[in-house]
Amino acid sequence: MVVKALRQISVGQNGVGAFIFPCKKITLQYCNWGGSSQGLRDFLTSKRLAKWAEKYPQIQFEVVAKAGHPVLKAEYINGLNKAICVRNLNVDHVELKLKLLRESSGAQLRHYPKNANVLSLNQSVRGVWSPLHVDPALRHRV
């Protein structure tokens, strides 16, 4: 009997085996002509990007010259993307936004209700409690 192997690509998950950096690619998009891109152009010419690339080899950096306002775009291992407009920001603020994208997990921001302690995809085993489902003889009388 011949055994056939399954052809699947393993999906990287943090906490299973090793730590995987959530951010996999950062694209720096700027305009050569526009004044709003001056901070990002200064960031690129000051060799700070080269230091970032040496410090974080697991992140792929891509520089794109395109008309319009400057944008930093990040791609994450969970398939989501984030984009931050850095128009009219100086070099230090551009680096802060780059750091924000690097440290982010890529997950969408959510509002959690005050008493939602457990998030689950499954229903409760006991069901939802309601005083109307109790036998009327056992209900508390005021």
UniProtKB/Swiss-Prot annotation:
It is found in: Mitochondrion. GO terms for molecular function: structural constituent of ribosome. Signal peptide: none annotated. Keywords: Mitochondrion, Ribonucleoprotein, Ribosomal protein. The keyword Membrane does not apply. Transmembrane segments: none annotated. It comes from the Eukaryota. GO terms for biological process: cell redox homeostasis; mitochondrial genome maintenance; mitochondrial translation. One of its GO terms (cellular component) is mitochondrial large ribosomal subunit. The keyword Transit peptide does not apply. Belongs to the mitochondrion-specific ribosomal protein mL43 family. Component of the mitochondrial large ribosomal subunit. Mature mitochondrial ribosomes consist of a small (37S) and a large (54S) subunit. The 37S subunit contains at least 33 different proteins and 1 molecule of RNA (15S). The 54S subunit contains at least 45 different proteins and 1 molecule of RNA (21S). PANTHER family: 39S RIBOSOMAL PROTEIN L43 (PTHR21396), LARGE RIBOSOMAL SUBUNIT PROTEIN ML43 (PTHR21396:SF2). This is Large ribosomal subunit protein mL43. It comes from Eremothecium gossypii (strain ATCC 10895 / CBS 109.51 / FGSC 9923 / NRRL Y-1056). The gene is MRPL51.
